UniProtKB/Swiss-Prot annotation:
Position of the signal peptide: none
PANTHER family xref list: AMINOMETHYLTRANSFERASE, AMINOMETHYLTRANSFERASE, MITOCHONDRIAL
Stored HAMAP family: GcvT
Gene responsible for this protein: gcvT
Family: Belongs to the GcvT family.
Subunit structure: The glycine cleavage system is composed of four proteins: P, T, L and H.
Keywords: Aminotransferase, Transferase
Pfam families in UniProt: GCV_T, GCV_T_C
Protein name: Aminomethyltransferase
MF terms in GO: aminomethyltransferase activity; transaminase activity
Catalysed transformations (reactions): N(6)-[(R)-S(8)-aminomethyldihydrolipoyl]-L-lysyl-[protein] + (6S)-5,6,7,8-tetrahydrofolate = N(6)-[(R)-dihydrolipoyl]-L-lysyl-[protein] + (6R)-5,10-methylene-5,6,7,8-tetrahydrofolate + NH4(+)
Gene Ontology BP terms: glycine decarboxylation via glycine cleavage system
Length: 365
């Protein structure tokens, strides 16, 4: 039977259509996915992301452990609260998961990992933590709400104490701080400003209701997906998985090659892939009528006149732009134009970098 977050009854009360999402009953939408999408882009929306897993790591060798476990390098994290985005790879260079890691103190780091990969992530982390004597604590006592949009931070501030407001004042992106019972982080999955807030489960219903009263609109998985697609953000299981290299998933920037003597899981395989070359993740725009969908083939000719085929990993109508967009994995050599096969029609598409909207503004037109 699917699990419920502590906010399940609140979703039902708000008129949500609930669906099974990787073993969790989650809101798909609360009536209009499009309206929820626009509200996040233009004002402030909130998402229940309590199905995600928060993992605390304690021990004197935690930093050393994470420098081995993760493709990005936590040596970059020198200021308490600073976070980074990274892949956690297997020995063949495939992506076990993508996650955020926070440096809280020299013997205390926090990971936030995906719900769909929870069991395998925890097994992998625990297995590799043991030689480093790192204590792995799953924080199932916490709930998680993402509040996103241009008015998100302002509306959240109205619910905080003076001390909490001062604690987060001027906090840059990709930081997290514990203030009172709230862990407030300037992270998100929408391309908008906002916070992801972890708090004790027994307090989350009251906090949700306070956010509602402050004019923050609930948004479901549907809007979350179109928002992250517009922002060019990957979804695990679509843009990458255990058989996909981060180099083929627009995650090359998250691989810390320096220093050269840092050994991390998957490094040797990635170095071979880097030498040989991999496929690449690109953006697609289709202004003609129709919708780009996952798994549709993408055809193009390279400079030598040879035809190649790729595949759409995520595609949808873009509510912000008013036409269809997609992320696609394609062989190298693609130019600015390609064709997508939709039923019996070959539809022309424009090839862009993977990212279409940031801070409410189009970045591809």
């Amino acid at each position: 039977m699917a699990k419920q977050t502590p906010l399940y009854d609140q979703h039902v009360a708000c008129g949500a259509r609930m669906v099974d999402f990787h073993g969790w009953m989650m809101p798909l939408h609360y009536g209009s996915q499009i309206d929820e999408h626009h509200f996040v882009r233009q004002d402030a929306g909130m998402f229940d992301v309590s199905h995600m897993t928060i993992v605390d790591l304690h021990g004197n060798r935690t930093r050393e452990f994470l420098r081995y476990l993760l493709a990005n390098d936590v040596a970059k994290l020198t200021q308490p609260g600073k976070a980074l985005y990274t892949g956690m790879l297997n020995e063949s260079g495939g992506v076990i998961d993508d996650l955020i890691v926070y440096f809280l103190s020299e013997d205390y780091f926090r990971l936030v990992v995906n719900s769909a990969t929870r069991d395998k992530d925890l097994a992998w982390i625990s297995q590799h933590a043991e030689p480093y004597q790192v204590e792995v604590t799953v924080r199932d006592d916490l709930a998680l709400i993402a509040v996103q949009g241009p008015q998100a931070q302002q509306k959240v501030a109205t619910l905080l104490t003076t001390e909490q407001q001062q604690a987060i004042a001027g906090m840059k992106p990709f930081f997290g701080i514990q203030t009172g019972d709230l862990f407030i982080a300037t992270t998100g999955y929408t391309g908008e400003a906002g916070y992801e807030i972890a708090l004790p489960k027994q307090q989350v219903v009251a906090f949700w209701q306070q956010l509602l009263a402050a004019g923050v609109k609930p948004a479901g998985l549907g809007a979350r997906d179109t928002l992250r697609l517009e922002a060019g953000m990957n979804l695990y299981g679509q843009e990458m998985d255990e058989k996909t290299s981060p180099l083929a998933a627009n995650m090359g920037w998250t691989v810390a090659w320096q220093p050269e003597d840092r050994q991390f899981i998957g490094r040797a395989a990635l170095e071979r892939q880097r030498m040989k070359g991999t496929e690449q993740l690109v953006g697609l725009i289709m202004t003609e009528k129709g919708v780009l969908r996952n798994e549709l083939p993408v055809y193009f000719f390279d400079a030598a006149g040879n035809q190649h085929v790729g595949v759409i990993t995520s595609g949808s109508f873009s509510p912000t732009l008013g036409f269809s967009i997609a992320l696609a994995r394609v062989p190298t050599g693609i130019g600015e134009h390609a064709v997508v096969q939709i039923r019996n029609r070959e539809m022309p598409v424009r090839v862009t970098k993977p990212g279409f909207v940031r801070a409410g503004k189009a970045i591809v037109l």
